[in-house]
Regions:
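STAS-typified acidic loop motif
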Residues: 2-39, 56
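Short acidic-hydrophobic, aromatic-tinged amphipathic segments that line or gate anion-handling sites
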Residues: 107-111
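Amphipathic alpha-helical interaction surfaces in cytosolic regulatory modules
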Residues: 28-106
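Short, ordered loop/turn segments at secondary-structure junctions
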Residues: 89, 112-113
């Protein structure tokens, strides 16, 4: 599934054999990306998508409005009892995500392989 070339969805398998839904973000993530980012997440059946990986490797630009969208997804996932991990952030955004408290809701990994080995 792909939404306006901003988000693609893929099923992966974690190290423990569990199914992980990977949402791969691409291009610019800002307030105009709401439908792509939040809408794609909200379209998932929460009961069958218990483990989510948010991959930012393809993101070229992410502003504070985009970070707010990520936080919205994380808050909804937390309420639904889903496990969320994040990978593919630049060193700068790893620092920003840590500073704004995103690590309270999702573990950060340098890449997909590291995330899958931990999930």
């Amino acid at each position: 599934m792909q939404t306006a070339n901003k988000v693609s969805q893929q099923q992966l398998t974690g190290a423990s054999g569990q199914q992980i839904t990977c949402l791969r973000f691409n291009g610019d993530i800002s307030s105009v990306s709401r439908d792509a980012v939040v809408g794609t997440y909200q379209a998932l059946d929460k009961a069958s998508h218990k483990h989510i990986l948010l991959d930012f490797k393809g993101v070229e630009y992410l502003n504070s409005s985009g970070i707010a969208l990520v936080i919205q997804v994380l808050m909804e996932a937390n309420k639904s009892g889903q496990t969320v991990a994040i990978c593919g952030l630049t060193p700068h955004f790893t620092k920003v995500f840590t500073m704004v408290g995103i690590t309270k809701y999702a573990a950060l990994y340098p890449d997909e392989a590291a995330a899958l080995s931990a999930l």
